[in-house]
Amino acid sequence: MLAIENYLILSAILFAIGTIGVLTRRNAIVIFMCIELMLNAVNLTFIAFSRHLGNIDGQVFVFFVMTVAAAEAAVGLALMIAFFKNRESIDVEDVNLMKL
């Protein structure tokens, strides 16, 4: 069985990759996937602490986070489709043009 430190290190690496992706990418879909990666890193931390402490509360909280993430994905993808139909691009720098 792996120690909790291994799970936390993996979670920190995944969160860092997601953060770098959000800060450096311009494609909305890639940014969206990086945000989901960050959410999954946090979920991994909740599961690791829940297992380490022998408490099921963290696992229950992960189910709620996954439900909210699924709703966020549906709304986010719908917004991206609407934006693509309007501008023929999903570059985040083009979002400012929606004000016109």
Swiss-Prot record:
Gene Ontology annotations for the cellular component aspect, listed alphabetically: NADH dehydrogenase complex; plasma membrane
EC number: 7.1.1.-
Gene Ontology biological-process annotations: ATP synthesis coupled electron transport
Statement: the UniProt record of this protein carries the keyword Mitochondrion: no
Superkingdom, natural source: Bacteria
GO MF annotations in UniProt: NADH:ubiquinone reductase (non-electrogenic) activity; quinone binding
UniProt keyword annotations, A-Z: Cell inner membrane, Cell membrane, Membrane, NAD, Quinone, Translocase, Transmembrane, Transmembrane helix, Transport, Ubiquinone
Sequence intervals crossing the membrane: 2-22, 29-49, 61-81
Compartments it resides in: Cell inner membrane
Catalytic activity, as annotated: a quinone + NADH + 5 H(+)(in) = a quinol + NAD(+) + 4 H(+)(out)
Membrane topology: Multi-pass membrane protein
EC class of the enzyme, as a word: translocase
Disulphide-bridged cysteine pairs: none
Listed InterPro entries: NADH_UbQ_OxRdtase_chain4L/K (IPR001133), NUOK/Mnh_C1-like (IPR039428)
Subunit comment: NDH-1 is composed of 14 different subunits. Subunits NuoA, H, J, K, L, M, N constitute the membrane sector of the complex.
NCBIfam families for this protein: PRK05715.1-2, PRK05715.1-3, PRK05715.1-5
Family: Belongs to the complex I subunit 4L family.
Role: NDH-1 shuttles electrons from NADH, via FMN and iron-sulfur (Fe-S) centers, to quinones in the respiratory chain. The immediate electron acceptor for the enzyme in this species is believed to be ubiquinone. Couples the redox reaction to proton translocation (for every two electrons transferred, four hydrogen ions are translocated across the cytoplasmic membrane), and thus conserves the redox energy in a proton gradient.
Name assigned to this protein: NADH-quinone oxidoreductase subunit K 2
Underlying gene: nuoK2
